[in-house]
């Protein structure tokens, strides 16, 4: 597997210790090319903020994480260019457009989206997503 789409449920695990954080870090050790929609920056920032509110991380750690994500993701994709395909997936799957942006990007790149989002895993077309817990290089 040479290209992966990473969603926010995986990216947050690079910065906050959660279940399967070790697996998420393995993606970074011998990384394939990592892709993400620009939307990931916002979702990651929101997830980091929630963890700050729970006193699990500091404001400094939030700043470090938001600064480092640009170096971690190899290819950023404009969310707007994925919107039409994401909307179609959203209607077909009866699922939030936010998540379908990641699926649309995976489809466009003929790649796989790695996620820890159980609901997304349950509704996504086969072969388009892989559970973080099941990901292997």
What are these model-predicted stretches?
Residues 30-31, 72, 109, 126:
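Structured helix-beta-strand junction loops
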Residues 46-53, 107-108:
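Short glycine/serine- and small hydrophobic-enriched flexible loop segments
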Residues 23, 43, 85, 122-123:
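Phosphate- and divalent-cation-binding pockets in alpha/beta enzyme and binding domains
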Residues 40-41, 61, 65, 82-85, ...:
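Short, conserved alpha-helical segments within structured domains
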